[in-house]
Amino acid sequence: MGRNREFDIDQALEAALCVFWKKGYEGTSYTDLTQATGVERPALYSAFGNKEALFLRVLDRYYNHYHDFFPAALELPTSREVVARIFRGAAELQTRYPDHKGCLYVHGDLAGSDDAEPIRRALVNARAEGETSLRERFERAKQEGDLPENANSSVLAAFVMAVLHGMAVQAKAGFSRNMLEAVAEQALSTWPTGSSAQSGKSS
């Protein structure tokens, strides 16, 4: 019985992540998962619990291993640099793998059944956390003079998230990295600047 657990947990999570990334939560069957991981269903149950629990583990892995550019970008000195880095990171990630393009945060919950509600809620919460961290970063940018005093940090954060969502959808539809980066540059062309940013340009 114990031999059913003799597989590499990390490799199994990575394989499951790729399947969920490609097919979404409800589009992924246990057959898909067992074929991708090479692990029988009882062993998957034993190691991870049910499909929902496995997806939540995958979501953590996705953030830590693939979405790490997002928290790193928040440390950059100006809000424009923050957003530019996030857009570049998203464009690269969303087109990195031909077999599973787009973003797990966006495509993971494209489903309608009540059974998927906990997954939708987890993904909504993950996106909300990202938006909150952006809003807080933009508030700091206002205090530093990097953004205008009348800039609406909540609207700017929502704008960035909306662009990211659109990029993910377009990547899934086949847009190239170059096209996504061009879209990002267009979005950045409207980015507001505060007194400190303007004085830096003139000096």
How does the language model describe each region?
Residues A12, A16-F20, A90, L164:
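Short hydrophobic clusters on alpha-helical segments that form packing/core surfaces
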Residues Q11, V19-A53, R57:
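Helix-turn-helix
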Residues L93-R96, R140, V160-R177, T190-Q198:
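Amphipathic C-terminal alpha-helical segment
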Residues K101, V106-H107, A151-Q170, V183-T190:
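Hydrophobic alpha-helical segments that form the core
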Residues E117-Q143, V155, A182:
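Amphipathic alpha-helical packing segments from all-alpha helical-bundle domains
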Residues R57, P71-K101, S153-V160:
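Hydrophobic alpha-helical connector segments
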Residues V82-V83, R96-R120:
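Amphipathic alpha-helical segments used for helix-helix packing
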Residues D8-L17, L33, V58-Y62, Y66, ...:
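Generic hydrophobic, amphipathic alpha-helix propensity
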